[in-house]
């Protein structure tokens, strides 16, 4: 069966993404010994990340994270909105909205129906 275009397996979308600091810390760092004093390991790492540079331009660093979450909820990519069908495919859970009636129309409860049992009791 051919891959559906994704570079990662389907189940990786259900796992949490590891933070970049954790993945960088796991890899061994090779430093050339040129006689210069090495910089502290965590001093400039956060300011050199492209995400943090972008958020500094916007202003509040937490603002970009909040806007990303809002975008995910609006586009329906949130995992809360997905369910897995019996075939294993992801389906979007859709909420049914109550339709709004025009002002001139009455709801079925308010309309005068001749076969309405509640009307006879009055």
From Swiss-Prot:
Record field: compositional bias (Acidic residues): 110-122
Biased composition (Polar residues): 46-56
Segments for region (Disordered): 1-122
Compositional bias per record (Basic and acidic residues), positions renumbered to this chain: 63-76
Alphabetic keyword roster: Developmental protein, Phosphoprotein
Any one Pfam family match given in the protein's UniProt record, by short name: ATAD4
Ribonucleoprotein listed as a keyword: no
Biased composition (Basic residues): 80-97
Protein name, per record: Proline-rich protein 15
Lineage summary: Eukaryota, Metazoa, Chordata, Craniata, Vertebrata
């Amino acid at each position: 069966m051919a891959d559906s275009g994704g570079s990662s397996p389907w189940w990786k979308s259900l796992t949490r993404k590891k933070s970049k600091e954790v993945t960088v810390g796991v890899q061994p760092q090779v430093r050339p010994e040129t006689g210069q004093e090495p910089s502290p390991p965590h001093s400039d790492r956060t300011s050199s990340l492209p995400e943090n540079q972008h958020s500094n331009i916007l202003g509040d660093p937490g603002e970009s994270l909040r806007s990303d979450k809002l975008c995910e909820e609006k586009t329906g990519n949130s995992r809360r909105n997905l369910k897995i069908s019996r075939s294993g495919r992801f389906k979007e859970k859709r909420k049914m909205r109550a339709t709004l009636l025009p002002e001139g129309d009455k709801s079925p409860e308010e309309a005068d129906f001749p076969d309405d049992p509640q009307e006879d009791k009055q």
